[in-house]
Amino acid sequence: MAAAASTLASLSATAAAAAGKRLLLSSPSRSLSLSLASRGRIAVMPHLRAGILSAAPRRAVSASAPAAATIAVGDKLPDATLSYFDSPDGELKTVTVRDLTAGKKVVLFAVPGAFTPTCTQKHVPGFVAKAGELRAKGVDAVACVSVNDAFVMRAWKESLGVGDEVLLLSDGNGELARAMGVELDLSDKPAGLGVRSRRYALLAEDGVVKVLNLEEGGAFTTSSAEEMLKAL
């Protein structure tokens, strides 16, 4: 009788092992529970296992900073640090928009790029030629800003033969253009210009915009020195 019981127990164990193998092949989640149970450990329930797997780290999605509102008449110019060379062999210098405009009447105009045709042939030469007339109307300084590095701006100044009439400033990282909301994305153009600044000319008194001639894109219709003189 004892031998029969032993044989029956052996057959049951063999059947259980075979069933375990079938479970292992057909259901990985069940095999995990069976394996833990066979070792005397607590089985991981299916719903708990699903929760553990779903708790894998997820990549955080950061929202991009909202674009700045486009500058308008009556606005205070945002502060930014611009760089320049005051002479061919001089040291690199920086000036903030705040320091440039504090307590002064300043004409600031922007171009999409140094050495580009319209900027080189019309926009900058026009302000160089009219700088004296602008000063006669109370303007303390005339400055051109572009999203180019300071070395390019120095080379451009030398090629144009610009003296003290107009200060050529580098907004190399586009800090001022972004803060003013006047970015101009030219990434789709074959010249490789990337993101630049829209063309504009403005008059600021103690940092507050009094006159603003902002072009659509890189057009050149209202931002000339002549148009600024008419507005003064």
From Swiss-Prot:
Question: What Gene3D superfamilies does the database record attribute to this sequence?
Answer: Glutaredoxin
The name of this protein is Peroxiredoxin-2E-1, chloroplastic
- Location of the active site: 119
What is the name of the gene encoding this protein? Answer: PRXIIE-1
Picking any one GO biological process from the record gives: cell redox homeostasis
Q: Which Pfam families match?
A: Redoxin
Extra remark beyond the main annotation? The active site is a conserved redox-active cysteine residue, the peroxidatic cysteine (C(P)), which makes the nucleophilic attack on the peroxide substrate. The peroxide oxidizes the C(P)-SH to cysteine sulfenic acid (C(P)-SOH), which then reacts with another cysteine residue, the resolving cysteine (C(R)), to form a disulfide bridge. The disulfide is subsequently reduced by an appropriate electron donor to complete the catalytic cycle. In this 1-Cys peroxiredoxin, no C(R) is present and C(P) instead forms a disulfide with a cysteine from another protein or with a small thiol molecule.
Q: What is its EC number?
A: 1.11.1.25
Q: Give the family this protein belongs to, as stated in its UniProt record.
A: Belongs to the peroxiredoxin family. Prx5 subfamily.
Q: Which residues form a coiled coil?
A: none
Q: Which InterPro entries match?
A: PRX5-like (IPR037944), Redoxin (IPR013740), Thioredoxin-like_sf (IPR036249), Thioredoxin_domain (IPR013766)
Q: Which chemical reaction does it catalyze? A: [glutaredoxin]-dithiol + a hydroperoxide = [glutaredoxin]-disulfide + an alcohol + H2O
Which GO MF terms does the UniProt record name? thioredoxin peroxidase activity
Q: Which UniProt keywords apply?
A: Antioxidant, Chloroplast, Oxidoreductase, Peroxidase, Plastid, Redox-active center, Transit peptide
Subunit field text: Monomer.
- Natural source organism: Oryza sativa subsp. japonica (Rice)
What are the subcellular locations of this protein?
Plastid, Chloroplast stroma
